[in-house]
């Protein structure tokens, strides 16, 4: 695994993919040109992957299909990954347990869904008021994030890899306008991760619900509000028909999904298949980030015309200040009680200070000077 992790940092996913495909093409041409003795075909290694998403789920599910297709192509069919959606395995929020138990060799989900089992898994999705996607990817691959994630997941018998980023998420769909902290009291909201802890501290009744059940829960009044992703996915799910107030984000500035691999299964693979799988996961993750950004931009451009019922809102400075204060207090409490939590928090905080200075003088300065 150590060598595999070093390779992850050494190679750029797309460059290596191109090189591997070129190498494979040359090898096939050479094999076709030269007569060879017939050799018995190797029996394919067939893995199963369980995903949180339902059949045909856009963007998230597409990333999993892309990864599996790349693995099969680059391995010449030596490794095949078959995908089971939540419709089949019926355990959308049980992916970690199934991969850990070896019921599935792989999984695709979001790390913060496991905070009830291990609070430190939250850090590897996103944290309120934390890093944006470029900063977070840099932390993962060059700032120690991968090492810390391995340390957390080792105890679960699982390797975890970045599985695709949504970018900055919207703050949620609400039935009624939220104008003050009093409006949040007793509000029932679906929101996962550490952001849920923050809102609970402010009086919100927080729950987590599987993606396939969100619309029904909102429609039946089981919840008063929910956050999901952003325009790339939310509008097609129809939340605006029930809860038209759509708030800008604060809680998930760079939500990273997650590929999980059973540790014993991965270690049993030949080295070249480990490398192929790692490259395919990395490429599929970044491709999902680009796709999510594209779809959000396209949907946002037409939101007023196509979805006139949507009312865009931003939380007041008073509410944002209270969220930040609650976030800081909860982080301090958790860090004092858990050395591992403290280690990861300090790593992210230190890296964000470095990265944010560059973000301010590069992207932020450019946008500030060029936004119309």
Question: What are these language model-derived features?
Answer:
Residues 2-14:
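Bacterial N-terminal signal peptides that target proteins for export
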Residues 26-136, 153-372:
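N-terminal secretory/targeting leader peptides
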């Amino acid at each position: 695994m150590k060598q595999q992790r070093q390779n992850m940092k050494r190679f750029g996913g797309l460059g290596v993919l191109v090189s591997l495909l070129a190498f494979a093409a040359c090898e096939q041409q050479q094999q076709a040109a030269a007569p060879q003795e017939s050799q018995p075909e190797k029996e394919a290694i067939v893995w199963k992957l369980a995903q949180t998403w339902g059949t045909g789920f856009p963007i998230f599910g597409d990333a999993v299909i892309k990864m599996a297709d790349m693995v099969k192509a680059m391995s010449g069919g030596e490794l095949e990954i078959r995908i089971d959606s939540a419709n089949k395995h019926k355990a959308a929020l049980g992916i970690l347990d199934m991969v850990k138990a070896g019921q599935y060799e792989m999984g695709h989900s979001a790390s913060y869904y496991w905070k009830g089992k291990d609070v430190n898994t939250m850090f590897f999705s996103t944290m309120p008021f934390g890093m944006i996607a470029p900063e977070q990817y840099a932390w993962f691959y060059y700032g120690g994030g991968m090492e810390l994630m391995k340390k957390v997941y080792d105890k679960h018998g699982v390797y975890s890899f970045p599985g695709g980023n949504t970018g900055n998420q919207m703050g949620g769909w609400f039935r009624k306008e939220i104008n003050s902290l009093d409006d949040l009291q007793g509000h029932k909201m679906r929101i996962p991760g550490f952001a849920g802890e923050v809102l609970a501290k402010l009086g919100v009744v927080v729950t987590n619900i599987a993606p396939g059940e969100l619309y029904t829960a909102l429609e039946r009044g089981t919840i008063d509000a929910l956050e999901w992703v952003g325009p790339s996915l939310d509008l097609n799910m129809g939340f605006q028909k029930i809860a038209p107030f759509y708030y800008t984000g604060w809680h998930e500035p760079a939500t990273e999904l997650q590929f999980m691999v059973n540790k014993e299964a991965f270690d049993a693979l030949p080295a070249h298949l480990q490398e192929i799988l790692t490259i395919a996961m990395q490429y599929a993750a970044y491709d999902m980030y680009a796709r999510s950004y594209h779809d959000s931009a396209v949907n946002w451009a037409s939101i007023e015309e196509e979805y006139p019922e949507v009312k865009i809102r931003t939380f007041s400075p008073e509410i944002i200040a209270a969220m930040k204060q609650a976030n800081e207090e909860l982080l301090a409490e958790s860090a004092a009680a858990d050395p591992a939590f403290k280690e990861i928090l300090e790593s992210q905080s230190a890296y964000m200070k470095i990265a944010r200075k560059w973000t301010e003088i590069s992207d932020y300065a450019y946008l500030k000077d060029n936004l119309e």
